């Protein structure tokens, strides 16, 4: 995947996450600026952003810590096989 393809896919998924949270939970504050998504919850602040050089999406979770995800077969996974959307669903209670 080239840089342009990565950017498009990463930006789309980050915007999708923001949209789904806003649709499903009005009590969570969402702020998306320059491909950095901040999610303010009662547990703390989540930060999701793209890392173009590594072609990864990074998640900082106040509940479970930091993660790096790569795109594989239509899903964002980390080296342990955990999926970005599954972690967010488990921790935020949002269906993605």
Swiss-Prot record:
Source species of the chain: Rickettsia bellii (strain RML369-C)
Record gene name: cyaY
Swiss-Prot/TrEMBL GO biological process terms: intracellular iron ion homeostasis; iron-sulfur cluster assembly
Family per record: Belongs to the frataxin family.
GO cellular component: cytoplasm
Xref: Gene3D superfamilies: Frataxin/CyaY (3.30.920.10)
Listed NCBIfam families: FeS_CyaY
GO MF assignments: 2 iron, 2 sulfur cluster binding; ferric iron binding; ferrous iron binding; ferroxidase activity; iron chaperone activity
Name under which the protein is recorded: Iron-sulfur cluster assembly protein CyaY
Keyword annotations from UniProtKB, A to Z: Iron, Metal-binding
A Pfam family this chain is assigned to: Frataxin_Cyay
Primary role: Involved in iron-sulfur (Fe-S) cluster assembly. May act as a regulator of Fe-S biogenesis.
């Amino acid at each position: 995947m080239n840089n342009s393809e990565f950017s498009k896919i990463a930006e789309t998924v980050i915007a999708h996450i923001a949209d789904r949270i806003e649709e499903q939970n009005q009590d969570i504050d969402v702020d998306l600026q320059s491909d950095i998504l901040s999610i303010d919850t009662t547990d703390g602040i989540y930060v999701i952003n793209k890392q173009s050089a590594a072609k990864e999406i990074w998640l900082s979770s106040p509940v479970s810590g930091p993660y790096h995800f790569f795109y594989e077969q239509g899903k964002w996974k980390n080296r342990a096989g955990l999926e970005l959307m599954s972690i967010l669903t488990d921790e935020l209670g949002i269906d993605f």
